[in-house]
């Protein structure tokens, strides 16, 4: 397709074997291999996006660039509080290992943090603690996959889960509970990723602070975030924990791997978490804000899920399926409730209809969902109740059938023998040939030719609308001086003119 804005499909990362997924040898066909599938690239949709470094626009993956950038950023933060005989916990999250289906950049950043702490402070007692949500085995799976247990040393790298022992922390809103083993060192380093991820929950308010109420918190405190508060006010929980005297007495600095919808863009590090948060917020408005706005404008299509992750955490163009489904401007705080959050789900009746006009329905353009590859371990029955769903193969059906969090999924879905059969059925009843594939591809999105043409036609107006109308509103709602952030030295150097 030389000279065209419609390209050959992008080959996604291969399936990852997981205790939560199907046997990978049963995945005999990927969705990008379907007839008629092409890709649309971000260089054509939004050419103003910053150049990715991993993979670059030629598809090259040079992990040394991640280390070089991380070393540069980490040598600029203050580590003077750390003494040579001190203990340090580097706090990570499992989400960092699933960016574009390739956790190598996040793993490299974690290793670099360890190495630079040793270089600058002489401290040797450095541990890695990786938090998870509902899939308690996943963190240890990624630690072994990237050999972080070997890199950090025996017993120094392990997962932490919400049901692990907790300790009380006095905060401005009362006693909350964090994980004991996250905070059992003298110092902590907050090591995370900046993609919008669950923006349907956090609404990009203090996004960089969220792991303090998620990855590092006990179940009781995580539950207040998800169920006691609405999607805009819940972020007070994370801020209260982070600003507590206990956590502040241990906090040193933060280091983030920074993607755009296209690929990894940079690494950011700062002692001031709120300054870092401002930078990633503006960056995400200018990048994720555009592809997410474009998604809300799509009409009549079939979704194919084909990624190593739970159903809500399947990626297309860097955006998870849960956000795609919401079909509203998730950055606009005037929008009260997305169509999907655990909080919103409680407001649907037994027929699957919102009980209040304040609850938005899921994306009306979704006419069918085809599940070729996904993991269990996350409540997902909501989607099979809302959208006609076809599961590819008994191996995939068995994943959901045996999953305690999805016991009723098969009551609302059918099983096809293989992917072509599933697609043939979906085309017939959905009455559309437009397809979008959630497979984590980097650089662009695998879609049908008809949907690629629709996206290319919509993109210029979306870009103008986001730049001139939406971003000023989003910034004002959060009390952010986005022009000052954009003109700051770190933002210009680290996010726009990346030094390699």
Regions found by a protein language model. Name each.
Residues 136-203:
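An acidic, phosphate/nucleotide-engaging active-site surface
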Residues 70-91, 122, 296-297:
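Glycine-rich phosphate/diphosphate-binding loops that line cofactor/substrate pockets in enzymes
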Residues 14, 19-35, 318-500:
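C-terminal non-catalytic interaction/assembly regions of soluble proteins
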Residues 174-261, 271:
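Divalent-metal (Mg2+/Mn2+/Ca2+)-assisted nucleotide/phosphate chemistry catalytic cores
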Residues 86-103, 127-133, 437-439:
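Short glycine-rich or small-residue beta-strand-to-loop segments that form or flank ligand, phosphate
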Residues 2-65:
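N-terminal amphipathic/basic leader segments beginning at the initiator methionine
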Residues 233-303, 308-309:
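C-terminal functional extensions of proteins
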Residues 103-154:
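Membrane helical hairpin/interfacial module
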């Amino acid at each position: 397709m030389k000279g065209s804005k419609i390209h050959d499909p992008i080959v996604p990362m291969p399936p990852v074997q997981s205790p939560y997924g199907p046997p990978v040898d049963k995945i005999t066909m990927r969705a990008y291999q379907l007839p008629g599938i092409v890709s649309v690239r971000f260089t054509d949709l939004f050419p103003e996006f910053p150049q990715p470094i991993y993979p670059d626009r030629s598809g090259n993956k040079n992990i040394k660039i991640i280390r070089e950038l991380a070393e540069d950023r980490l040598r600029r933060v203050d580590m003077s509080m750390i003494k040579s005989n001190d203990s340090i916990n580097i706090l990570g999250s499992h989400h960092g290992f699933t960016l574009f289906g390739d956790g190598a950049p996040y793993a490299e950043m974690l290793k670099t943090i360890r190495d630079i702490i040793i270089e600058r402070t002489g401290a040797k007692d450095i541990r890695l603690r990786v938090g998870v949500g509902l899939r308690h085995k996943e963190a240890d799976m990624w630690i072994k996959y990237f050999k972080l247990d070997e890199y950090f040393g025996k017993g120094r790298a392990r997962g932490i889960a919400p049901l692990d022992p907790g300790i009380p922390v006095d905060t401005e809103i009362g006693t909350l509970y964090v994980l004991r083993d996250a905070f059992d060192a003298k110092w902590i380093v907050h090591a995370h990723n900046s993609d919008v991820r669950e923006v349907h929950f956090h609404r990009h308010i203090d996004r960089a602070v969220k792991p303090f109420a998620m990855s590092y918190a006990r179940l009781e405190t995580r539950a207040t975030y998800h169920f006691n508060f609405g999607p805009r006010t819940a972020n007070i929980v994370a801020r209260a924990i982070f600003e507590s005297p206990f956590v502040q007495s241990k906090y040193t600095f933060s280091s983030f791997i920074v993607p755009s919808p296209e690929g990894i863009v940079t690494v950011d590090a700062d002692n001031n978490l709120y300054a870092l948060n401002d930078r990633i917020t503006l960056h995400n408005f200018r990048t994720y804000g555009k592809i997410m706005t474009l998604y809300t404008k799509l009409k009549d299509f079939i979704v194919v899920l084909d990624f190593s992750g739970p159903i809500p955490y399947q990626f297309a163009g860097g955006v998870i399926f849960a956000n795609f489904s919401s079909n509203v401007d998730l950055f606009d705080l005037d929008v009260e409730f997305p169509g999907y959050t655990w909080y919103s789900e409680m407001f649907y009746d037994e027929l699957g209809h919102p009980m209040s006009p304040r609850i938005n329905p899921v994306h009306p353009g979704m006419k069918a969902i085809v599940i070729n590859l996904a993991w269990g371990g996350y409540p997902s029955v909501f989607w099979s109740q809302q959208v006609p769903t076809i599961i590819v193969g008994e191996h995939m059906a068995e994943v959901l059938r045996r999953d305690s969090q999805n016991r009723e999924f098969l009551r609302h879905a059918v099983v096809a023998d293989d992917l072509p059969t599933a697609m043939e059925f979906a085309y017939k009843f959905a009455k559309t040939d437009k397809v979008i594939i959630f497979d984590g591809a980097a650089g662009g999105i695998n879609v049908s030719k008809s949907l690629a043409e629709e996206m290319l036609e919509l993109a210029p107006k979306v870009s103008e609308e986001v730049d001139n109308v939406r971003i000023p509103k989003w910034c004002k709602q959060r009390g952010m001086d986005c022009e000052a952030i954009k003109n700051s030295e770190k933002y210009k150097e680290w996010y726009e003119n990346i030094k390699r």
